[in-house]
């Protein structure tokens, strides 16, 4: 039994899912193969992910492989109710409604775990966390993690000998983090900022906090829209890289003083805190494109504000001392709450990794330790080659002579 908003939205969801499928041909090829082989036949798969049209295509691929699939949302504001309705109609157990309370959010997580999944999929390690605390009663073969934030949490668990089953860090596959994180986050985060605020980005001072793959993407897209980009980054190598890309590189305090828009992409807590609010300009807009809603210290902001008013869909105005600070999407993921998330074409590769990881866990879990794993390189290369061809690219083929030269040590300067 699913928990959704309105089953009558299914026809709308079907159109949205089918539109995304047009741009997800790598995943579609896997789905056709899975339909023939049924590699996940009889397995229960529990997923905690953003309930979007792209995710729907992954869920339908797993179902085509023979799995019984249950899905809940990884973010209360990212659920597309029409997509949830269509998936429920298609035989996927769905527990997701846009805008649910925290209590309902965790009820939905538990509903997925009540299906006794053999394999779980996470977008932030919420299911895995429950499987190591309140729901340690549920045995699983293994799990998968989609995000940088989730992988950090899992590697910490492994380091402290707390992880009790193998997990595939899908985020660490090149065909995920080099494309989804950079190009997907960059485009969708700036799309969310523009949709929420209707700002002209050209000429604004846009501060990007964090210069990992996601931060690089946001900085590139903001710069491409005409912004004056400043990067905040604690890692000296990344900071130097940002500088050589042509961006200003400043401390968070000095960057906060000049910002018109700040996008936090750190995966860490309180990247924007009271000391930053104190020096910000009147009318600054704050957005989170990292993961959890802790990057902006909203408790401190609210505590020291005389009023909080919703002035526009996805925009809250905090009256902080004698100025206004605008928070987008309640400090949650701006690209999913205020826009439609990553383009389907880039999620195609990420979800191809997820689908293949499910089969890999099923085939190998008996020989795996409770550690964080990365999919084999050949999986990455196969996904990349397929996507390259679909986008009209051509792969260079080395000659036998060139391959032999690269494998030898005898040849040098003659």
Where in the sequence are the language-model features?
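Adenosine-phosphate binding glycine-rich loop
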Residues: 9-26, 40-44, 52, 165-203, ...
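Glycine/serine-rich phosphate-binding loop and adjoining beta1-alpha1 elements at the start
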Residues: 1-40, 74-79, 84-204
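Ligand-binding pocket scaffold of soluble enzyme catalytic domains
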Residues: 4-9, 15, 28, 36, ...
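A short helix->loop->beta-strand "cap" motif at the edges of active sites that frequently abuts
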Residues: 66-68, 92, 138-139, 163-165, ...
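Glycine-rich phosphate/diphosphate-binding loop of Rossmann-like nucleotide-binding domains
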Residues: 49-67, 176, 180, 184-259, ...
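ADP-ribose/adenylate-binding Rossmann-like module
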Residues: 73, 120-122, 136-150, 268, ...
